[in-house]
Amino acid sequence: MSHAPFIAVIPARLASTRLPNKPLADIDGKPMVVRVAERAHQSSAARVVVATDAASVADACMQHHVEAVLTRADHASGTDRLAEVATVLGLPDDAIVVNVQGDEPLIAPTLIDNVAAHLRDHPDCAIATAAHPIHDPADVFNPNVVKVVLDAADRALLFSRAPLPWARDTWTPAVMAGSVAERPLPAMPVLRHIGIYAYRAGFLRRFPQLAAAPIEQTEQLEQLRAMWHGERIAVLTTDDAPAAGVDTPEDLTRVRAAWAELLAQDGP
């Protein structure tokens, strides 16, 4: 897959209920948001920008020579924050912007490249994202694991926290009465959505004007707003599950250990 010119933007909010000051959490001597930016710089991104509403995060980025844009504090979502950045940077409508989550310091640079290229290869779509097959029944029935089903052209038909698709002939009442671990996976692959997005800058600027969708509010999945308003989302399916992000102190401990292993394998 050839690389598409793109900009990587990392939204970073300081407020976090489960892990205060999360973007500034230390990972081997540097703030987590800086570690994410370093991973993004290992991709083919022409530019890597942190978008934050906190001066302390912007200052930390600048101390480590990471470009940062200070955005408004009243954005309802990370996508709204990206829309402001697209305007501030004066990006042309056809520019590709990849939203890299600020709490995923272990993200694979190749995944960033591939999602950007996937959007370039689907000119009929405003957004591209990624998914991978689920192999653990517990994940299928976990509402914190978002599922996606695709059409024949690998565009998203629906995202949901519910088991999707519902395997009617496999998950019989007798099977559902048993433990989750004993429920077989259906013949059709169940795909887990990976929270990375590539957007066209023109769509980003339109997004804040789109009314919230009832299904978006019910599922609490922001990407459903775009689909509700008729936008198409191209989905790249990958066999490799990405490393989990950081939401809790326990996650941070796990990621610090994984980072140390990464350094041992690849060097600093």
From Swiss-Prot:
Chief site of localization: cytoplasm
EC code: 2.7.7.38
Disulfide bonding pattern of the chain: none
An example Gene Ontology CC term for this record: cytosol
Keywords: Cytoplasm, Lipopolysaccharide biosynthesis, Nucleotidyltransferase, Transferase
Pathway: Nucleotide-sugar biosynthesis; CMP-3-deoxy-D-manno-octulosonate biosynthesis; CMP-3-deoxy-D-manno-octulosonate from 3-deoxy-D-manno-octulosonate and CTP: step 1/1; Bacterial outer membrane biogenesis; lipopolysaccharide biosynthesis
Record-linked Pfam families: CTP_transf_3
Location in or out of the cell: Cytoplasm
Gene Ontology molecular function terms on file: 3-deoxy-manno-octulosonate cytidylyltransferase activity
GO biological process, one term: CMP-keto-3-deoxy-D-manno-octulosonic acid biosynthetic process
CDD domains: CMP-KDO-Synthetase
Catalytic activity: 3-deoxy-alpha-D-manno-oct-2-ulosonate + CTP = CMP-3-deoxy-beta-D-manno-octulosonate + diphosphate
Stored NCBIfam families: kdsB, PRK05450.1-5, PRK13368.1
Function of the protein: Activates KDO (a required 8-carbon sugar) for incorporation into bacterial lipopolysaccharide in Gram-negative bacteria.
Family, as annotated: Belongs to the KdsB family.
Protein name according to UniProt: 3-deoxy-manno-octulosonate cytidylyltransferase
Organism the protein comes from: Ralstonia pickettii (strain 12J)
Gene name of the record: kdsB
